[in-house]
Amino acid sequence: MVQATRLRAAVIGSTGYIGMACTALLAGHPDVELTRVLGHSSAGKRYSEVVPGSAVDLVIEDGNDPGSADVVLAALPHTVAAALAPGWLAQGATVIDCSADFRLHDAAAYKTWYGVDHPTPDLLDEAIYAMVELHRESLKSANLISVPGCYPTATLLACVPALRAGVIEADVVVDAKSGISGAGRSPSLGTGFSEVNESVHAYGVEGHRHKSEMLEQLRDAAGTDVRLTFVPHLIPMTRGILATAYLRPRAGVTAEQLREIYASFCATSLFLDLVARPPATKTVTGTNRAAIHVGWQDGVAVVTVAIDNLGKGGAGQAVHALNVRFGFDETAGLESRVLWP
């Protein structure tokens, strides 16, 4: 139910790329009052001084205290929010975490992929995966919400409709490409301009850590274990994800049947567009939209998905989940494009 007063929101980690996008979306949200922005490196400065073009004039606070916020959007490095979330929940806030800390239900898998013991494993089963198209009803009563990664978002949109319908084999191959902002705002040698410009390379070929959450969600969709071959690539553009999934239809399944399945799936969301030709990332830049194309080649289904890694693959998905959780219009705060960086 929509609250009579505006929802009070705090963004923790507000000066990283995802945090900046969350802040921008909430600042323009008709049902939300942005009450705190927090970030260690720029603490004490006005937000508008730190983030180009921002109209938010709050002073950036140090620490991790959301104050009296009704909802906390945490955009912190992996392994940080896991220890802080219990305190935020105890203060009565709904927590929307943009890191990987609550995406997995298996604490052992978390340690394998993120290198540390999960400090609050008892919360893993409480967290709801914030992909509205898959978990809309569960999100309506969730207190701990975990925003999917950008690669998983695109991969799941490409594979889940067919797996749910039982029309493909449980063995999928996904080739995905990401812009540089997916690596975060902190400078590093591997994402510097001279290193990535005019060059494309694969990485994580032996296993990308986002694969673990993909496998959990794919298993839920298929009702059985799914074999996933996933290879990500870094490409020299600022933002965007393009994922191409190669799916093997079961005997008798036609291209038209598969397209109808994806059309029905897309019809359940205001943010999914089934398009007539393979999409370009530029068409969804700065938005919470996903463009999905279903193709067919020599008996293999080829499903291509384009999203913005900071939008549908990050902050946009977080705000979409917020809207569902608090009974707001699902498009609230998501009508305009956020184009920095």
Task: Tell where the protein language model's regions lie, with residue ranges.
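Predominant activation on well-ordered alpha-helical scaffold segments within soluble catalytic domains
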Residues: 23, 156-163, 211-215, 259, ...
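N-terminal Rossmann-like NAD(P) cofactor-binding subdomain of oxidoreductases
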Residues: 1-198, 203-205, 223, 295-297, ...
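C-terminal active-site/capping subdomain that shapes the small-molecule cofactor and substrate pocket
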Residues: 246-341
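Short beta-strand or tight-loop elements
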Residues: 127, 226, 288-290
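C-terminal substrate-binding/catalytic lobe of Rossmann-fold NAD(P)-dependent dehydrogenases
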Residues: 206-274
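Conserved active-site and cofactor/substrate-binding residues in soluble primary-metabolism enzymes
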Residues: 17, 126, 150-157, 205-213, ...
